[in-house]
Amino acid sequence: DGKYTFTMPDSKVTITPTFSKIEDTKPSKTGFNDVASSAWYADAVQYVTDKGLMNGTDDNQFSPNASTTRGMLMTVLARYAGEDTTGGATWYEKSMEWAKAKGVSDGTNPNADITREQLVTMMYRYAGSPKADGKLDSFSDAASVSSYAVNAMQWAVASGIVNGSNGKLNPQNNATRAQVAAILMRFCEMSK
């Protein structure tokens, strides 16, 4: 709390305080205060930040449990493709134009949170819509995958990009930044 108690002895005393800077301590190699080394997504966060695909939400925070927007994913994929994402009237404008031109996204709703099935669909399109031969029937919520996303989800499952959680794909759930980092890392490793 920054308070100190001093009891004056009976004789004359000289006190000389010494102050030293304490370096910021980071709980993980990522450099983000909110990403513990033991977190299931720590390696993925390190990977995507090292590759310049994702940044922190500020200098010390990654915000792993925050939602990811469609514009964020368009930007990440454009960066992965080597595109310059700087400039434009908005931070995502150049990425959105790239995503539309490449058929990755229709460019709508860039500020909307992205669902897991939308995430996988954009990545599937980025990959060139490869053959989708994965089975979804082992997931209890497979029927909740939207028809437009079925092939993409089958591909993502077969490729090991998406593992699901507790036997569910959660396709309608918003994708957190940690989930996006993990899926991106798997995608990049698969694409090598």
Regions found by a protein language model. Give the residues of each.
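Conserved "repeat-terminator" motif of extracellular CCP/Sushi domains
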Residues: G2-P27, V76, M122, A152, ...
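Proline/glycine-anchored alpha-helix kink/cap motifs
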Residues: P17, V48, A99, Y126-A127, ...
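Feature responds to low-complexity, polar/acidic, surface-exposed segments characteristic
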Residues: K21-A42, N55-E117, M123-A149, V162-N174, ...
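Short glycine/proline-rich, acidic loop/turn segments that cap or connect secondary-structure elements
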Residues: N151-S159
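Disulfide-stabilized extracellular recognition modules
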Residues: A175-T176, I183
